[in-house]
From Swiss-Prot:
It catalyses: 4-amino-4-deoxychorismate = 4-aminobenzoate + pyruvate + H(+). Its EC number is 4.1.3.38. Transmembrane segments: none annotated. InterPro entries: Aminotrans_IV, Aminotransferase-like, BCAT-like_C, BCAT-like_N, Class-IV_PLP-Dep_Aminotrnsfr. It comes from Schizosaccharomyces pombe (strain 972 / ATCC 24843). Its main location: cytoplasm. SUPFAM superfamilies: D-aminoacid aminotransferase-like PLP-dependent enzymes. Belongs to the class-IV pyridoxal-phosphate-dependent aminotransferase family. It is found in: Cytoplasm; Nucleus. GO terms for biological process: carboxylic acid metabolic process; folic acid biosynthetic process; tetrahydrofolate biosynthetic process. Its cofactor is pyridoxal 5'-phosphate. This is Putative aminodeoxychorismate lyase. Converts 4-amino-4-deoxychorismate into 4-aminobenzoate (PABA) and pyruvate.
Length: 231
């Protein structure tokens, strides 16, 4: 099996968005998995050198087990935030204690398989909502998620097997979302057509519509946005 690298992705728009959180997460994963760590300053210097000739870009960097760092820059003009269709997965995934879920790794088989079996395409603003074998909602394949419950937005608990996203961390710290400590976010409690918040450090926060019955996707996406606001 090919060795998996650690990686991070963020938005550069004059600043590398949430860079300290990205470096902190990568360092923690490197320590946990036995990857050589070249140091935060070394990585930051490589990133700043890579973006110096662009004003806005998608920035991705990888860390090999030997401690080698590679940086990829994709310049962009604007950041589209089209509403996403979030499709409930057809089957549970083994996410608990899965290194590829709780760390950000280039081995993304669990996410690729979910996209494929649900015929979802990122190019069509589609993603898939995963849940574990206990029925607890975890995350989408490229986003953390939050659902509106009891007057507030709540996000799945890390104990169910999901990535501790940097944007998730930011929203929790500023009180915009709250962690689900009551087990409310279960597959069987979801509602077809309900609004969901999707977030990562590249697209920041996007709106989405949950589709439990895919054939109703087009109809639901035409409905007026919910009056619920991110508080």
């Amino acid at each position: 099996m090919e060795e998996s690298n650690l990686f991070e992705t963020t938005l550069y728009d004059g600043e590398l968005f949430l860079l300290p959180s990205h470096l902190q997460r990568m360092k923690a994963s490197a320590k946990s998995l036995g990857y050589s760590w070249p140091g935060e300053q070394y990585i930051e210097n490589k990133l700043r050198e890579a973006v110096q000739d662009t004003s806005m870009a998608r920035v991705r960097w990888e860390l090999s087990k030997a401690g080698d760092v590679t940086v990829q820059i994709v310049p962009i003009q604007t950041l589209e935030k089209a509403p996403y269709t979030l499709i409930l997965d057809k089957q549970p995934s083994s996410t608990e204690k899965n290194p590829s879920c709780i760390n950000k790794m280039t081995n993304r088989a669990i996410y690729i398989e979910a996209m494929n079996r649900n015929d979802a395409q990122y190019s069509k603003a589609q993603d898939v909502l995963l849940y574990n074998h206990q029925g607890f909602v975890t995350e989408a394949t490229i986003f953390n998620v939050a659902f509106h419950r009891n007057g507030q937005w709540i996000t799945p608990s890390l104990k169910h097997g999901l990535l501790s996203g940097t944007m998730r961390k930011n929203l929790l710290e500023n009180g915009s979302i709250h962690e689900d400590d009551k087990g409310l976010l279960q597959k069987d409690n979801l509602k077809n057509g309900e609004q969901v918040l999707l977030f990562n450090s590249f697209r920041k926060v996007c709106k989405g519509v949950l589709i439990i019955q895919p054939e109703k996707a087009c109809e639901l996406l035409k409905k007026k946005d919910s009056s619920e606001k991110l508080s």
